[in-house]
Every structure is written in structure tokens, then in C-alpha cells.
Amino acid sequence: MKNNKYHSHSRRKTPWDEEEEVSDVASFVRDEYRSHYFYHHRPLSETGDSKLLNKFIPQSCPYCHGKKYKRNGHTTYGLQKYKCIDCKRNFTITTGTIFQDHKLSISEWIEYLLNLFGYSSINLNSRINKNSETTSKYWLAKIFMLLSDYQKDIILSDCVMIDETYYSVIKSDIITKDKKKLRGLSKNKYCIGIGCDDQCLYCKLEGKAKTSDTKTVQAFKEHIRPYSHLIHDDEKSHHVLVQALHLKSESYKSTYLSELNDKDNPLDKINHYCDLLKKFLNAHLGFNREELQGYLNLFSFMLNPPHNKLEKVEILLKFALNYRKTMTFRGYYMKNPY
């Protein structure tokens, strides 16, 4: 019997699957829906996956990292197999990557990414691709894993802007006092530090509640080039960063900024990024807040160069085939049963 603990509703089902006689209209709707479903779930032998993947040459054995190996036949869908001379184990170009043992085609993954870059929610993406929500969430977790170190080397320079934006904890985690929500920038909100220059965007989860000297320095110190020009809103903790990195400070009081139109606001650019980030997070309403930094890494990747979505897909696909770390469906949901 199939264990449905980690599986959600199948997109394959229609209301007429068990009925022997249906109306002409129902029959047409069912057949068109099934046609669309099976187009998105073609066997790998009918896709171009193997043709693409066979153009990639392994750098080493994914098991022992030996450099000597030989060709050793093909999989049932035409993917080149190799055998390591040292450890004698068989492998393919996808062994040890997020595509290991994949059942859905890479073209499906491409469409998923394009939808995701267009601010589609997990639910909407699963409907478009005719996948279960658990599958879509699992794919997103794989993307988070790929992008886990994406922002590590981002260094903002020259004219830099920074700000903080806040995002609420999930309803079940809200802290109350005398049955009332805590006021202001309390532990009921996550603090997100955002910085940008003329080229790049950087986003870092600082923790809960209002920012502080320590949080600001930890978030930005390694990601802003010393002696840069910093434009900010005169948040007290920013001045510690200014001193630490010898920045040229251009600050504005919040009361002054609140009276300006967007076009006259010197922080309009960073404010726009804050608004876009909240729009992006709201598209994934109810998401697991433990994955918040994963969403921030993805958001940064989406808004940073290159700006063409197809070029972003190319970058992720190449990286995925060289990133030797995998994740199983069951392993993910045992750790994140949401």
C-alpha cells in the first residue's frame, strides 16, 4: 500500500475518472486536461534529457573522486554510464547532483524556474506544471540548496544603500502579552537587512525584532567595500558600520523621508527593493519561516544580473550539474514535514 504521508493531491485526477458515461463536454475537458498532464509528464526516454546530459563530461568519480573512468553502456533512457577504474562503481553525470534518479524531465524544471522567477507561488506553479504541491516544494528546496552560498561573494561598492524591512512570523508563532500582540518591531517580526549598489542586491536575515549594532555589522561588514559612499536612513546601528568600514555617510532622518514623494526620495531604489521582496514573500504566503534565508537568496538571484530569465535558467542548470550534493524527497519531508 502506498504511503501518502508526504504526498498531496495528484494533479492527474479528474472528476470523471471512475465514470463509464460522461457528457460530450466533460469528455472533451477530461481529454484535454489529460493531454496537458501527460505532456508535462513524458517518460525521460521521450525527452531530450539524455542528448543534453551526454554532452557533459564528468570531472571525476562522484564516489571516490578518482580521475580515471571508462564508458560503461547507457541507462534505459539513453544516458551515458561510466565505471570508475579505482572504486569500480558505476555512475552517470547526474550521480550525486539534484538530478540523480530524477523522474521528471529537465524541461519541466526549466518551466518551473521561469514561473518561479515570475513570482509564481508554489501552489500556482504546481497547477501550471501539473505537479503535486509536495513535488513543487521539494523542487524549491533543491533550488535553495543550490543557492545556499550564492550571496557569499557579493560585495557592494561605490554608492551603496542599505535599509531594513520586517516580515511577520507565522500566526501560530505570534507572541502575545495579556492576549494582545506585542507592539512595534517585536519578536513577532523578522528583520531583513537589504543593501544595493548600481549592480547588485544583497539580502540577509538578521534575526527577529529590531536591528542592532551587532546585527547590522554581522549582516553587512563582509559585503560592503571599505571607503564606499553609504546612503541610509540614519538608523543608529548604521553608524557603527560606517565607522567599521570607514564609509562616507549620507544619512536622512525617517521623518524627513516620509514627507517626500517616491521620485524625490534619495532611498527610493532600496525602498523599491523592499516592496518587491514583500511582494515575493507574500506570493509564498504561509511558507516555512525556517527557510526564509533560502527565499532571500533566491530573491537576490532573481534581481541580480543577468536580467534575462533564460540566462538565469542556464546558470542554474550548469551549476546544478556540477554541484555534488543531492537531496531525496523522503529525506526532505522527514526533516521539513510541512
Show where each model-derived region lies.
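Residue-level recognition of single "structural anchor" positions
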Residues: M1-Y338
